[in-house]
Structures are given as C-alpha cells and as structure tokens.
Amino acid sequence: MNGHFAAIGNGPTAKQYDHGIQVIDEDKSFNTNLNDYLTETHVAESGFNYHLISVFGSQSTGKSTLLNHLFGTQFSVMSETERRQTTKGIWLSKNKRDSANGSPMADNILVMDVEGTDGRERGEDQDFERKSALFALATSEVLIVNIWEHQVGLYQGANMGLLKTVFEVNLQLFLKDRQSQTRSLLFFVIRDFVGNTPLENLRTTLITDLSKIWSSISKPQGLEDSKIEDYFDFAFSALPHKIYQPEKFLAEVDRLGARFTTGHRSTKDQEFGGGVFLPEYHRRIPADGLSVYAGGVWDQIVNNKDLDLPTQQELLAQFRCDEIAREVLVGFDTVIAPLEEQQVEAIRLGKPAAVLADLGAQGAGAREKCIKAFETQASRYHKGVYTMKRGELESKIDTRLKALYQAQLTAAHKAGVAAFSEAVSGAVKAGQKAGGSYEFAEIVAKQKAKTLQIFKTEAKSLSIPGVAWSNFKPQYKLFEKELDEVSARLRKEEMRRLAIRVERWVRSRLGDAIGLEFNKLGSGRGGSVSPEGGEKPATEKDLWDRVWNAFIGIVKEAETRFAERAKSFEASPEEVEVGLWRLRRKSWVALREKIEEEVMESNILMKLRENFEDKFRYDEDGVPRIWRPTDDIEGIYTKARESTLGLVPLLSRFRLSETYAPPDLPAFIGVQPAGVEPEDEEDLLPIGGIDEEEGKSLEEETTVLGESKRQDLVVRFKKMADGVYVEAKRSAIGGITQVPLYFYVILLILGWNEILMVLRNPFLILLILVMGGGTYIAYSLNLLGPMMQMSNAAFNQAVDIGKDRLRDFLVNNETARQALAVPARQMGADISLDRLDSRGKKAQDISDDDDI
C-alpha cells in the first residue's frame, strides 16, 4: 500500500520525502506536510520557477510506470501478477532527472500521480474522480492523458468521460475570471503504439471526439459558439510497447522527456515536438504558497463549495503576504527594537531624549531591507493583494519609524534650542569679558545658521526617498520658528541687560550731577574762595531748573546710547520704543531716589547750616569775618538766617522757576507703547500723575518735603543758627577784655627799686637776656619738653644717690650702726647708677644670669 511514501499521518522524514508525498489520501484528506516536502526538495524557494504536471488515465494502464521512467520518480506500480489498485488518492514527487535525450529538462518539475479512473474499488462512485480532476486542473499546467492506441476512438476506454469532466470543471473554474483566460495543455501519451495508424490520424480522431464532447456540454451565456481550442492546447506523443519493445520504449521515453522544458507557441507542429511548458499554462502560484493554495482549493472542492480560483488566489496571497510580512518584520525588529528601547529608557529615567547616532541610516537600511525581502517573496502573488499588503507593511514599518524619527527630531529640537541658547549666551559673556566689543545680532545670526544646519543635516539623514512623511519640512519650520522665539527672548534679555547698564550709568551720572547742584546749597560764599567753580550760583531759586536740565541732558544721552546699541541687536522699533519708555520711567525714579537721599534730615540740615555759616561768617567777597563789638551781628545773623530759611520752601517742591509748576512729567515719559507686555511692568514703580490707578497726583509726586518735615527742619535749623549766633557774640565780647591802666601805674611804683637794681647790674641784664634767648630758642625748637624730662630724671637720680650715701654713712659709722643695729657693710661695694630710657625714666634691669 505504498507504505514507503510519506503518507498522511506519518511523521515526515527525509527518506520518505525522497520517494514523494501523498497529497490527498483515499479518504479525501489533504496532507498538511506538503510544504515541508517542498521545502525539503528546495522547490519552495523557487518562486515561479517550477512546473506542475498531472497524469490521468484508467486504472492499471501504467501511469505510475510511465512517470517513473519519464521523471525518475518512484511511484508504486502494479505487480504484473496482480490486477489491483496501486495509486490511491493523489501523489506528488519531484522530477529526479536533470536531462533527457541529451537536452536539459525544466527546473523543479512536480509530478502528480492521480488515482486511476474506472477502478473496481470505487465502482460507480465517480465523486473522487470529479474532485481529483477539478483539483488537478486548478493546480496543474499540463494534464497527461495516458491511453492505449487501441482505446483511441472509444468513449470509456479513451477516458472521454474523464475528459468531459475536465472540460466541465474548466468552465466552472476559469470562465468565472474571463480576464485571465487561463489555458491548459492536454498531453495525450499513446501507449503500445504499433505505427500502423499514423499519429496524425490518431490526433484527428481524438480532436474530433473531444470537439463532440465540448459541443455536448452546457456553456455559459455568450460562449455557446466557443471552441475547445479557445481554452485548451493539445500535444501528442506515442510510445512503443514496454514489454515487447523495451529498448525502443526507453528510447522514446527519453525523447519524450526532452519535451518537458520551456516552449514557445509557434506552429501546429508544436503539438508533436518542442517544449510543453508555456508561460500561459502556469497558474502563477509561488512555490512557497503552493501548499496553502492547494489546501484551500481542496477544502473548497471536498466540501462541495463553489470553487472560485481567483478568490483562492487572493486568499492565498493574503495568507502568504501576512506570513512573509511577519517573517521580514523579525529582521526589522532586530534593528529598530534596541533603538526604541533606548528612547523609552531615557524617558523612564527622566533623562532628556538623546539624539541617537546614525539613526537615519539604520532606519532607512532596515526599512529597505525589509520591504525588498517582502517584494522578493510576495510580489509573485496576486498583484492586488500584494500591493495592498505591501502598503500595510510599509504602514507598519513607517508607523514605528515615524514615532522613532519624531522622537529623534524632538530630541534634536530640544538639544538644538539648548545649544543655541548656550552658544549665544557664551558668546555674549566672552564679548563682555573682552571689553564689550561684540555685536549681538551677528552672534545670533551665526549661531542660528549653525544650529539650523545641524538640525537640517539630522532631518535629511532621516529622510526616506519617496516617503512623504519623512519630509520633515514642517518640523524644520517649527524648529526655525522656535529659534526665532528664543532669539527674541535672548534679544529681550540682552536689551534688559543693556537697559540695566544704561540705568546704572544714569544713576551714576545723576549721583554726580544732582549731588553737585545740592552741594551748591552749602555755599553762600562768593569770590575766588567759593567751593564750586570759583563762583556761587547766581541765584538759589533756579535749583530745580538746574536739576531738571541736568536730568534731561543725562536721559537724552542715555536714550541715544540705548537706541544705538539696540540697533546692533536688530531690535524692532516697537522693542526700542518700549525700552526707551522704561528707561525714562526708571530714570525718573532714580532722580527721585537721589533727591530723597540729598534731602535726608542729616544731609539737608548740614547743607542749610553750611549755607547759613557761609553767609554769616563770610562777607560778600568770601573773606572770613572777625567779629568786633562795633559789628552789626544781629543784622547779619537775621539776614543770613532768613536767606537760608528761604531755601526750605524751595526744597519742599520740585518746581521750575519760570512756570512755578512741576515739570511736565507725563510729556517727558510719554504714552505707554502698545508693545508693552505685563512682564515689562513688573519691576516698574508707580509714578504720580502717570499711573492714575495708583491714586497719586503729579503734585504729590513732585513734593519733596512734607509739611511736618519742613516744620521740624525749620525748628532744628533755628536752634543750630542760634548756637552759631551765640558763639559769634561771645567771640566779639571776648576780644574787648584788657588790663586796666592803673595796674601798670601800681606795678611801676611798687617795682621801681627792683627795676633800678637790674638796670644798674649789667650781669643780671646779660643773664636775663641769655636765659630769655635760650628759652625762646628751646621753645622754637620744641626742646622745652625734653629738657624738663632730663631735669626731672637728673633730680630723681640725685635723690637716689643721696639715699645711697646716707645708707653708706649709717653702715660705716660705728656709733650710728650701733644705735640703729645695722650690720657692717662689706668692703669694696660700689654705688650703682640707674640706666635711664629716652624719656628719663628708669630702664628695666637686664639680668646677666642667662649668659652663664
């Protein structure tokens, strides 16, 4: 029972595959191991480069024997001593011969040995006969009809019933898809050919019988007049008797084998010679999908369903394309999955997404390799299904690549923005360290071009030719837009820093200029001795005019500096306008703060005192006054005091002398520009008369000293002025104190005798002159102090020496010693002298014990 073949239910082995495989068993079950056999025999990888042949004929007519000799197969054959069925179901084996009759045979020829018809085992049951014919016609290019010469002209003997079935199922299968116009080759192999009847005559008989059968079958509408030649080609070959002419039989079989190669439709002689495999015979089922296709066809046949081959081809294409897609995606995953994991890991760890190196080349390479592998294997299937599945595969690949690439561009976007910001900030800092000689706009333009080029290079590396979504122009535009936003932010920050530098410059200049104007209040002197400029101000009433003019000049210069520097930033006119508006507001606040500093209680009181003292202590020429009793101290005091007190109302309010009104602060600051944003106002202090919502008027804004402060200042100034007046009064009165004249008369009368004694003694006169001159010289040279110290030291030294002499006398005098009970002094003792320092004091004793 053909037990040496790989039958259904048996585990497939290489040895069994060497003998073929039972595709359909006698119970009409399909063998799912067919694909294993095709793989083992290397047919599955051949694509369309294979050919499938089926052989039909009555039972025990030598079909299997013919195939074994023709293709080198090992199908089971009937024993010559028995007459029973040998081939059950449908068997398949690969051609084992490479050439025949010296000519190469076609590659990968698959031969199906179909169970013979008219067998006693099945009897009247023709169901399997019809199903096997339908299966063979749906899968095979060439149908070999094995008949004996003496059966030609018979109906049953020539298998005309089987051929009628073939014609009917042909209409059932292929005429549903009229666009394909699939043809088949009926190859009649006439066995035991004697040669009495020419093969041409046998052909004519067979064609005539076949045409009658074709005319008798029912045809679809519109094909009633069709001919059999419209759907079938015919080929004929004759073989001698195998038993009686074995050598000739083998020679003719060898010649017949040479015809199983690729042929071309040319002439009628094609039926008797030339290759039998024409392109239009091929069912266009790739070898790797043949098993699935055959299984689907048989399932439809065995379940008596309406077999639709185009649908089966589409189903096969869908199955195989899905299978191929899964296979090629494995290689794609090998490349892409690690890259996806790197991005996911970075997100999980909270790290900024890193730009993966060479991602574009890896992604594009994996995509191209995957799609090419799919094309190579799947393009052989149904074109519509293949195109659809290719699109689905590309969609799957592109979905993953797009997510990966988008994350890559997002990382490049973030890294680029950060690098751009750092580069600009670093260049600005370097320029500031180098002395401030840098152009912000040039730095921004250079770094922007560099950053855009890096991003563009990365985006181009991710671009895939012909893939619309990989054209990252929107992302490039978005990146460029954000760089512009960052540039604007950096420019705004730089303008803020510029504004701060200008504000510092304004504060510095205001500190000098305003301090100078207020310092002039401390001088009431004129002439060359006046402290500022050699001349005092013409009038003190124009203090605020001078302050305002100095302020306006400084601010105008600051505005010019700011505007010129802002141009190098390529700042818009609106940004410059906002910056100047902020500068004017900040400058006014700085002026107010400086004025408040100058009018602090201690500062303003000191300036008022200096102003008063200059007017009171100095005359109009700036010469200090020496008070005499005859001077009008009260009048000068009153005038100087009232003049100085007149400064208090002047200092109380910021008013210009010409209009006696505050300066036009709203006009100076100007209307708030339309481009001012909330953040531009965060650090601005409210200004009265400008910011009405603060509820502070311009009059209040320009008030420097409040009423209570003014009164307190006046009281304290008057007390201070009164003290100066009392001091001057005392000075005048102290200058008139002198010795009365009668004192000199009394001194002359009482000291007349002493005067005469001195005058009469020249030595006394000389002594007095010498002592007086020496004293004057010592006084002039500041030697009186040292002389007194030396005298004091000499006196103290004399006292000590006297004490030592007295002690020596008491010790050496017997009477005194006995009286005082003092022991005798050793002889040879010296009287010690003290060492004096530079101030005439005893120096500390230095012991000589350390020298021992």
From Swiss-Prot:
The chain crosses the membrane at residues 739-759, 763-783. Residues 475-500 form a coiled coil. Residues 760-762 are lumenal. It comes from the Eukaryota. Disulfide bonds: none annotated. GO terms for biological process: endoplasmic reticulum membrane fusion. Gene3D superfamilies: P-loop containing nucleotide triphosphate hydrolases. InterPro entries: G_GB1_RHD3_dom, P-loop_NTPase, RHD3/Sey1, Sey1/RHD3-like_3HB. It is a multi-pass membrane protein. Its main location: endoplasmic reticulum. GO terms for molecular function: GTP binding; GTPase activity. Residues 1-738, 784-852 are cytoplasmic. Residues 47-294 form the GB1/RHD3-type G domain. GTP binds at residues 57-64. One of its GO terms (cellular component) is endoplasmic reticulum membrane. The keyword Nucleotide-binding applies. It is found in: Endoplasmic reticulum membrane. Belongs to the TRAFAC class dynamin-like GTPase superfamily. GB1/RHD3 GTPase family. RHD3 subfamily. HAMAP family: Sey1. This is Protein SEY1.
